[in-house]
Amino acid sequence: MIQELFRKDIKDFRPYDAKGEKYKIKLDANESFIGLSKEIKNKIIRSLIELEFNNYPDPDATKLKKAYGDYIGIDEKNIMVGNGSDELIQILTNAFLDKNEKIVTLNPDFSMYEVYTKVRGGKVSVFDLDEDFKLNVNKIIEYINEEKPKMFIFSNPNNPTGGVIPKYDIIKIIENVNCIVVVDEAYMEFYGDSILDYIKKYDNLIVLRTASKAIGSAALRLGFLITNDTLLREIKKVKPPFNVNSVSQVIGEIILKDKDFIRESIDKVLYERNYLLKELKKIDGLKVYETKSNFVLIYNENANEINESLIKIGIKVRSFTDENLKNFIRITVGSREQNIEVINCIKGDNYDYKEM
């Protein structure tokens, strides 16, 4: 009886897999391996002592927006803060999609675009990247114009491949489609060629950012939506009033003001990324994809066995059940010690590697 009360369209729905098992080394969620500095931690402690826990948080996250605007060089009036990028994706589907209306996204890409669209009652049209995970810009423009979606959303750099769509190609898409274009730049600090400077030039452009990756603050659940005045005014109508808690606002502001710490953290990740890429490429039988993110995607026909061996020694990486990614593994860039453990396990004599 109770089961009949649930929506029929979510009966066979597959939720996002975010299990919380404990591992010695966790390299599956693209988190930063760098902890906060002692100086930042001391500032946080002093600020939390003064925090008024009896009051609701600032609904506009005013100070946090100002700090993030200073960090990215964008007017705070063009920024909205969310409880992680996930909430902002959900807000966008609520703002733009009526039931059965459509988005276009890429395959492969971040699965939450599809999840929130379906929860909203919308439909998803998927455009496949080519076998090397490259995007044919002319074909995606043609596809979008045929599908007539309300929104085209994609990650750049791409998750899970680490590949990028050049800025000039994104501009070409924006100028030649009749829908909202959402560029999820969760990993942009590891790449650098952002589309942010164009938010006021194009009336159909929205950019998403996060504090969970380069800024190293996944625990805070802070996401940022950046767009022009007109779009932001309408999107705010469906934003919950107290969606970002006071603790996250205070801590986020403190971290964002320490630009030297963030820059040094990014440099450390990039240094280790180069090391991980170099060492993985030395292993016969692995196809290693170039990346502009804080993770590396690898392919091998024995990927499942590699994954199981890593798990046995307490290392968690990201494997996939999707048919087009079943022999792939995504490895978050870790510390030098963590990267060495991963490399030593993968290049052990446990596998009969097959050349591709």
Swiss-Prot record:
Classification via Pfam families: Aminotran_1_2
InterPro entries named in the record: Aminotransferase_I/II_large (IPR004839), HisP_aminotrans (IPR005861), PyrdxlP-dep_Trfase (IPR015424), PyrdxlP-dep_Trfase_major (IPR015421), PyrdxlP-dep_Trfase_small (IPR015422)
Cofactor: pyridoxal 5'-phosphate
Reaction catalysed by this enzyme: L-histidinol phosphate + 2-oxoglutarate = 3-(imidazol-4-yl)-2-oxopropyl phosphate + L-glutamate
EC numbers, comma separated: 2.6.1.9
Record-level GO BP terms: L-histidine biosynthetic process
Modified residues (N6-(pyridoxal phosphate)lysine): 213
Pathway where this protein functions: Amino-acid biosynthesis; L-histidine biosynthesis; L-histidine from 5-phospho-alpha-D-ribose 1-diphosphate: step 7/9
Membrane-spanning parts: none
Keywords: Amino-acid biosynthesis, Aminotransferase, Histidine biosynthesis, Pyridoxal phosphate, Transferase
GO MF terms, alphabetically ordered: histidinol-phosphate transaminase activity; pyridoxal phosphate binding
The UniProt record lists the keyword Disulfide bond: no
Enzyme kind, highest EC tier: transferase
Domain of life assignment: Bacteria
Similarity-based family: Belongs to the class-II pyridoxal-phosphate-dependent aminotransferase family. Histidinol-phosphate aminotransferase subfamily.
Subunit structure: Homodimer.
PANTHER family, alphabetized: HISTIDINOL-PHOSPHATE AMINOTRANSFERASE, HISTIDINOL-PHOSPHATE AMINOTRANSFERASE-RELATED
Protein name: Histidinol-phosphate aminotransferase
Gene assigned in the entry: hisC
